[in-house]
Amino acid sequence: PVRGYYLDETRGRVLTLSYLKQVADRMAYYKLNQLQLYVEHTYLFSGLSEMWRDETPLTAEEIRELDAYCAKLHIELVPSIATFGHLYMLLSTKSYGDLCEFPDSWKEPFSFWDRMQHHTVDVSGGRAIELIKAMIEEYMALFATDKFNICADETFDLGKGKSKPLADEKGVHRLYIDYVKELCEFLVAKGKKPMFWGDIICAQPELIKELPEE
């Protein structure tokens, strides 16, 4: 059975590789066997320096080293990133602010509440999902596991801004499942098993059958 721990590496100081290894050591002591590492601006994504330039993000080399370290402790290290909702650090940049459900989001002053409640990607255009796929592909390459958590939670703004006409036509839940399905199929094609949170899909659980069996 999976005995896991979910580590949110996006709040406050970025945890160092040394500290993350200590987390793995403690997990091994308590016989936990899966660590999910959630990042946003705290990983050095290629071409997204606007998102992480004010931080000390984890590098690809550090992630690979942590993955190998966890494997020696019989811990599966699983990648996890935001792909849909609360993408504050990405969607508040000048280069990618136009991908937000609400325009000019990058001009708004920071607040923790706003960060969590808003900054959902605009699904009515194709540019957002292609960027997200590129981020997924880059991050998943650093892990030995066949699992990937796309999160897809807290999409509170979906259908309320740029995608409202589409939501009025198809329904908000249709927009949600179509977007998540495309990401899941992308992962399955890469040999991965997608995972995501159930807070949104549970409102219409019958839509789950549209997703890949993996």
Segments predicted by a language model, with ranges:
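Feature activates predominantly on carbohydrate-active enzymes
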Residues: 1-195
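Substrate-binding cleft/loops of secretory-pathway carbohydrate-active enzymes
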Residues: 195-214
